[in-house]
Amino acid sequence: MNSIEFPLRDRTTQNSVISTTLNELSNWSRLSSLWPLLYGTSCCFIEFASLIGSRFDFDRYGLVPRSSPRQADLILTAGTVTMKMAPSLVRLYEQMPEPKYVIAIGACTITGGMFSTDSYSTVRGVDKLIPVDVYLPGCPPKPEAVIDAITKLRKKISREIYEKQIRSQRENKNRFFTTNHKFHVGRSTQTGNYDQGFFFQPPSTSEISLTHFSNIKKRVQYPPTK
């Protein structure tokens, strides 16, 4: 079972039908099946390697390490990142399909660590290269902290999915044609507040009053007749 409490609308409804899209279904299933790409360079990555053992058993969280960035949706950076390694890290991140997430593990990845004071080739924070979703400080952080960071990322993904659904419902737009046969995209009109500008139609010649026509006729200056 998924340990993340996904905010369902009604848990007590029986014999109900849930309608969704294929994209939302894949996002929901991603909560328990994150495929990480391991980018480790130093001692912090050794702490993450201990999660593979039977004591922590990170397989129960659905984590399946991938060797190709095209098959991963999460990249775990651990250790010092140098200037020469920066282009390869950016390329790996760009090759990952959307949506993609980043967890920065350890002080060296987050701020440069002890190498940031007197090193000319150390990147002072991996967030200067790629966007980071979860920061995990420590030198090195414990395996329990890594599991907690992954749990926080899963909660963040669940909130993003739910907020996206609410936002799409609030910004529900309807497509319709006006009386002038013009196509418009507007918000939902279930509230009864209609935009009268959509229903404006220029009057035809049969609807022009005689007084309006006479005023226009007076303004027109005809050339003098001989």
From Swiss-Prot:
It is found in: Plastid, Chloroplast thylakoid membrane. Binds 1 [4Fe-4S] cluster. It holds the Pfam family Oxidored_q6. Its EC number is 7.1.1.-. InterPro entries: NADH_UbQ_OxRdtase-like_20kDa, NADH_UQ_OxRdtase_20Kd_su. One of its GO terms (cellular component) is respiratory chain complex I. NDH is composed of at least 16 different subunits, 5 of which are encoded in the nucleus. NDH shuttles electrons from NAD(P)H:plastoquinone, via FMN and iron-sulfur (Fe-S) centers, to quinones in the photosynthetic chain and possibly in a chloroplast respiratory chain. The immediate electron acceptor for the enzyme in this species is believed to be plastoquinone. Couples the redox reaction to proton translocation, and thus conserves the redox energy in a proton gradient. This is NAD(P)H-quinone oxidoreductase subunit K, chloroplastic. It comes from Lupinus luteus.
